[in-house]
């Protein structure tokens, strides 16, 4: 194996140029990385030199049917392709949303989202945030976006700062989008009241009230969820797009600083998430219990291109000749992207009921004072009980950072077995929670803690647990995993993987 690795190292070194190619090993080739080999990534999309300017929402809408409200929302958001995007997500299997925080606390006191039909009707004429102030849909937080570090020693702090910036921006946007959404809910409810007054047998006030409760139970929650899907799909995509292109314009000028990192994504949903804090993963990349291959990267980039996001580049994974994108296959038996968006909607719309001490049993009955949501009952029920949610722990993609001039790995028989000590390992505190316990066959906890966990106020809900979204079915035998970042199993696999990647 060592002979193959040496030859592979020389082959990679020959691409990096110079008379020293004959003596370069893979580490030397990494240190001599030339980002010009990847072409010019700046031509791929728009550039953002700074935060976007303010964009104010219109005043809350007047009572109107659902179709008119959806059309108005599309125009207000500048999102004419929103319905087409939602339809397309019905045929996507990628989990784009479940790693993003639900921010359900923003909706806990919203009477318009109550599970009690009487409470909803009572909130029909209450004020919404858009009544008192103009809502800036491009609102920004006070957390600045850091500049890329000059050397890899500053990468842990940089990645933590990027993540904190994105989550703060998303929170600031959602505070405004929540007010926008509640204004549309009120308009929808007032329209249903007018419909109840025009219905048959609604001559008396009591009959009209009963008819309105029936309409709330039969239509309000379902139609409000359609408004929520459109609004929050735009919020997630627009926020991820803006921050990602700003990162792209920064990181594309400093790609060499990211070469020494080892990236590990314990869960696939972390890899398919809308937001990536590092767009140039030129080190070795591990996905779930194996290593990322070129096909997986092309499929991820296909979806990112459809969403207007910058591509994720990986110098060791990409093939020399060929396209950067490839359409992913679709399986009707697997969860769909729209289902993961529905999980976010469910968490937000169900926040008042959960804050009130539990969920009412929902069915097809139409009882007085209770919202029988029929099919949308599933949309608002929590995915699991409090005990199961409490067991969910934070899973973080890990990165291995070898500083220049640092001794290398010693154990194992693979590429890192020639008198080297382990490099520094940093944990990447991300917005995703994992299932309880370590991932089966995945890497264990990092022996070095760098304190990159995202801090939040005590009592504020964190990101949605893994059980909140549909789970991807897995069949067949699992691949061998890099079980220990410092053990022989990992070295052997990594050495074999490097031979595959560098075997010309």
From Swiss-Prot:
Disulfide bonds: none annotated. Pfam families: Alpha_TIF. GO terms for molecular function: DNA binding. GO terms for cellular component: host cell nucleus; viral tegument. It is found in: Virion tegument; Host nucleus. Residues 361-378, 447-460 have a biased composition (Low complexity). Keywords: DNA-binding, Host nucleus, Host-virus interaction, Phosphoprotein, Transcription, Transcription regulation, Virion, Virion tegument. The keyword Nucleus does not apply. GO terms for biological process: DNA-templated viral transcription; regulation of DNA-templated transcription. Residues 354-381, 395-421, 435-486 are annotated as: Disordered. Transcriptional activator of immediate-early (IE) gene products (alpha genes). Acts as a key activator of lytic infection by initiating the lytic program through the assembly of the transcriptional regulatory VP16-induced complex composed of VP16 and two cellular factors, HCFC1 and POU2F1. VP16-induced complex represents a regulatory switch: when it is on, it promotes IE-gene expression and thus lytic infection, and when it is off, it limits IE-gene transcription favoring latent infection. Associates with the VP16-induced complex; binding to host HCFC1 activates VP16 for association with the octamer motif-binding host protein POU2F1, to form a multiprotein-DNA complex responsible for activating transcription of the viral immediate early genes. Belongs to the herpesviridae tegument protein VP16 protein family. This is Tegument protein VP16 homolog. It comes from Bovine herpesvirus 1.1 (strain P8-2) (BoHV-1).
């Amino acid at each position: 194996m060592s002979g193959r690795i040496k030859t592979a190292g020389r082959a990679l070194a020959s691409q990096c140029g110079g008379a020293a190619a004959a003596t370069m090993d893979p580490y030397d080739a990494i240190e001599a990385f030339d980002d010009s080999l990847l072409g010019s990534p700046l031509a791929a999309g728009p550039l953002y030199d700074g935060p976007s300017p303010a964009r104010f929402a219109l005043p809350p809408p007047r009572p109107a049917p659902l179709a008119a409200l959806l059309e108005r929302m599309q125009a207000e958001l500048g999102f004419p392709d929103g319905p087409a995007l939602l339809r397309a997500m019905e045929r996507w299997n990628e989990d784009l949303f479940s790693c993003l925080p639900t921010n359900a606390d923003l909706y806990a006191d919203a009477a318009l989202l109550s599970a009690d039909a009487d409470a909803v009707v009572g909130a029909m004429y209450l004020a919404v945030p858009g009544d008192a102030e103009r809502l800036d849909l491009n609102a920004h937080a006070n957390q600045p976006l850091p500049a890329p570090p000059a050397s890899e020693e500053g990468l842990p702090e940089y990645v933590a700062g990027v993540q904190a910036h994105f989550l703060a921006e998303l929170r600031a946007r959602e505070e405004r989008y929540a007010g926008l959404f509640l204004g549309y809910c009120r308009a929808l409810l007032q329209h249903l009241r007018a419909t109840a007054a025009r219905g048959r047998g609604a001559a008396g006030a009591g009959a009209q009230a009963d008819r309105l409760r029936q309409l709330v139970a039969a239509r309000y929650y379902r139609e409000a969820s359609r408004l929520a899907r459109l609004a929050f799909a735009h919020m997630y995509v627009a926020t991820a797009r803006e921050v990602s292109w700003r990162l792209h314009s920064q990181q594309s000028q400093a790609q060499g600083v990211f070469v020494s990192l080892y990236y590990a994504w314990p869960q696939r949903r972390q890899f398919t998430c809308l937001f990536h804090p590092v767009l140039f993963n030129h080190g070795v990349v591990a996905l779930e219990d194996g290593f990322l291959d070129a096909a997986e990267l092309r499929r991820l980039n296909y979806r990112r291109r459809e969403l207007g996001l910058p591509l994720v580049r990986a110098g060791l994974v990409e093939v020399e000749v060929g396209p950067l994108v490839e359409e992913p296959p679709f399986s009707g038996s697997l969860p769909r992207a729209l289902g993961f968006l529905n999980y976010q909607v469910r968490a937000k719309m169900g926040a008042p009921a959960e804050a009130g001490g539990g969920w009412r049993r929902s069915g097809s009955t139409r009882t007085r004072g209770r919202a029988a949501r029929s099919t949308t009952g599933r949309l608002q029920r929590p995915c699991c009980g409090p005990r199961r949610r409490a067991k969910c722990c934070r899973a973080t993609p890990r990165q291995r950072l070898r500083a220049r001039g640092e001794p290398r790995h010693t154990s194992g028989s693979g590429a890192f077995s020639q008198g080297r000590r382990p490099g520094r390992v940093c944990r990447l505190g991300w917005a995703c929670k994992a299932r309880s316990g370590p991932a089966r066959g995945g890497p264990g906890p990092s022996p070095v803690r760098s304190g990159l966990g995202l801090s939040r106020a005590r009592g504020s809900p964190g990101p949605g647990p893994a059980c909140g979204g549909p789970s991807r079915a897995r069949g067949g035998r699992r691949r061998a995993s890099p079980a220990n970042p410092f053990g022989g199993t990992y070295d052997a696999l990594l050495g074999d993987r490097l031979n595959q990647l560098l075997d010309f």
